[in-house]
Amino acid sequence: MVTRLWIPLAATLLLGSATYAQVPRTTTAPVEVRLRSINDLLGKADYIAGLIGQQQLFRGFVQQIPIDPQQGLFGLDTRRPIGLYGDISLDVEQGAGVLLLPVANLETLMGFLQAQAGWQIERKGNGIMTISLPPDGPVEALYARFTDGYLYVAIHESHLDAKKLIPAKNFFVQDDGAVASVVIRPDRIPVVMRRELLAKLDETLQQLQREALTKTNPAERAGFILGGKSVISLSRALIEDVKELHLKLFVDEKRDYISLDLTVIPQPNSPVAKNFASLGQRTSLAYGLTNVKGAVLRGNINFALTDDMRKMWDDLINSIMTQALHEVPPQNKDAVEKILEGILPTLKAAVADAAITMTAPNAKGHYTVLGAISVKEGKKLEDSIRELVKLYERDTGDTKAVKLNIAKVGNFTLHQIDRILPPGAETYLGTRSLWLATSEDLLVFSVGPDASLLRNALSNGPTKSPVLSLDVSLVGLARLANQNATPQQVNAIATQIFGRVGPVGRDMLRLEVTGGQNLTLRLSVQGGGIRFLAALASANP
């Protein structure tokens, strides 16, 4: 039910409305798409082909493209950018998109379309061209107007009124370096359509509440309500409180990386703006603690539920706790109650603040993993750990695996648990033992050959953190997860690509979400990492 709401909204953002198209526009549109010039796109594609070892093949293909310095490509100007803009509406059939094609020679382009594509073109006295398309297509005709060196193309003639066109010089005035970009302005949704969408959300919410009543399991019912209301709240925020969405693709040959950026710009002083600002100010002891040198993997999450979500979260936690106690064997009920009492304050806080890191392998090929989780009332959590140990020792008879309160490091108490990990873990970590460090506000764990990593990390302090992040060394990942190549083969290919200095800082795959004035998501990969993966795939087809 909730998913279906996104279908008309997505269609709305892409195709638009003829009615709303009648409003004069001079500089911006509700939806804007920009592509770099054909020459630039071919240059970026050449770089990408080089990353995957196919540059020679690609250049052979490019040589077959008939680009003329004066006539362009079949009359299209290959030196200037391409654009598309439109409006927002639920009336998909009346799409108000306008395509901007740069033209080097209009007659050459018209001749190509008529001779090669078989399109019939009629020029009218008002400057509009009617392009008749083959039958049985999605539309019978297109309409075009040539001005300022660009051919404006639309499905409806009314969209090409000369007074309402966005001048190409205004549309392409800013060059941010993106290969492709999409701008969506939800604040330009027409009032009538906004009311329709909000009414659909209210209707869906009522339907969710009715469906929730049919769930006999309390935990399932609470989870159903929380998930449904979360999606509806996000949808409502997009309609009411988001000003602009920017999606941009960057391909940077000089800095050797590719990235996809999404920026959400809120309405000033809106609840969403305040939430974004709060996310931008968050610090994390867990994130600071896992900041170690030589990491091949590092990630974190750090956010708190909004006030309107916390009540539903509490209901879900209470339902899960009640169900867990109901299903536990009678002989374990007292112990499980004590365990849940220690976990409950952290869960009720409705804060997700955790981080993890993994160092590069040592000479024996073993990794060390370090993780940290923010907790509430850590002393109660320590009591829960003791109860878990009692259950473990009672059920297994092993009274030597767990060693509590081994040492104190600052505010932390160290514990060691032997033989807790599966036998296969020893291949990668060199051990099956787990180290724990507990304090009033943090739970830290470490496993691997570098026992000093945990002790040294405990002296780190809190630091500003992103909402979500994941940094992965692609070479490090290949050493760990590639089943078709030995570590020696991986190292040889890494040396081939990066030289003796190694891949450090040049093979990263990164995902980061940050708050602040806007909410920004960036997914990027360094060129060296792509070259390495391509070479590894070629060596092990």
Model-predicted segments: where are they?
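Short Gly/Thr-rich strand-loop-strand
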Residues: Q71-L76, V103-F146, K380-L434, V467-I497
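Positively charged n-region of N-terminal signal peptides that target proteins for export
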Residues: M1-L5
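Helix N-cap motif at beta-to-alpha junctions
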Residues: P102-E107, H156-L160, V375-K379, G448-A451
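Sec/Tat signal peptide C-region and signal peptidase I cleavage site
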Residues: S17-A21
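Structural boundary/hinge residues at secondary-structure and domain interfaces
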Residues: Q22-P138, V173-E244, S259, T263-G365, ...
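Bacterial N-terminal signal peptides
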Residues: W6-G16
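Ordered core of a single globular domain
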Residues: H366-S374, L442
